Amino acid sequence: MRVLLICVGRLKAGAERELVTRYLDRAKAGGRALGLSGFDTIELSESAARRPEDRMAEEGQAILGALPQGADVIALDPRGKNLTSEAFAERVRTGRDGGRPAAAFLIGGADGLSEAVRARCDLMLAFGAATFPHQIVRAMLAEQVYRATTILAGHPYHRA
């Protein structure tokens, strides 16, 4: 199963980009033996529309256009469900074992996700009730993806 992060906005060179790259490279190395591949990031341009609803609609169309057919679509959203790291790993396992061709993790723009994207999601996921900058959320997501591969592999990285 291909693992993909689809994000509105681009990470500039710096500590956050390096951290995301490091976690995804680690996930890629460990994921091969688990039947997981890719661990790629697609960065979509932020909309320049004036109204928030127009920005969400434009960004939503770009997100939907980037989704692989048949993917398990999991979006980060503050109103989403909180999962333990073990439950997150189990979600990845279930998608893989269920024959899903891809797991697509979505991070929307500053205004959030359009209703069209929300309707396409199989799961809305939250990393708690706090608000985080998008670049930090991307690093947190990359770490959880890596942690999921270590949990599935029985690696000692995860010691909960």
UniProtKB/Swiss-Prot annotation:
Alphabetical keyword list: Cytoplasm, Methyltransferase, rRNA processing, S-adenosyl-L-methionine, Transferase
Keyword flag S-adenosyl-L-methionine: yes
Transmembrane segments: none
GO cellular component terms given for this protein: cytoplasm
InterPro entries from the UniProt entry: Alpha/beta_knot_MTases, RlmH-like, tRNA_m1G_MTases_N
Keyword Magnesium included in the entry's annotation: no
Catalytic activity reported: pseudouridine(1915) in 23S rRNA + S-adenosyl-L-methionine = N(3)-methylpseudouridine(1915) in 23S rRNA + S-adenosyl-L-homocysteine + H(+)
Annotated S-adenosyl-L-methionine binding sites: 76, 108
HAMAP family linked to this entry: 23SrRNA_methyltr_H (MF_00658)
Function: Specifically methylates the pseudouridine at position 1915 (m3Psi1915) in 23S rRNA.
Family listed: Belongs to the RNA methyltransferase RlmH family.
Name the UniProt record assigns to this protein: Ribosomal RNA large subunit methyltransferase H
Annotated source species: Azorhizobium caulinodans (strain ATCC 43989 / DSM 5975 / JCM 20966 / LMG 6465 / NBRC 14845 / NCIMB 13405 / ORS 571)
